[in-house]
Amino acid sequence: MSDHLEIRRLNDAFRRSLSGGGKRLMTAGIAALPYPDQAAILVRVMEHDSFPEGDDPYGEHDFGAFDHAGQRIFWKIDYYDPTEEFGSEDPADPAKTVRVLTILLADEY
């Protein structure tokens, strides 16, 4: 399996389960939304299955965008080393990687 395919598998599993394997963050803009909107956005992130080449050039499923209640929402997975000080040297290796999922309003990017 290529690294890109393994990274995609790990990203999809992390994003869909939203438990273990990393951290989840939401920006101030998302946190300021009413709880039902936050919950709906989280479900959309978990169920996201549209990865056009322009958003996902390496096929790793590490970025997504969608509209919710008239606002553009982005989500992004970044890869850090276990100390979370530097980027991961090998995002395909869970022992060397902490995944961080950030959910944000597009205008916060």
Language-model segments: what does each one mean?
Residues 62-109:
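Short, compact, well-ordered microdomains
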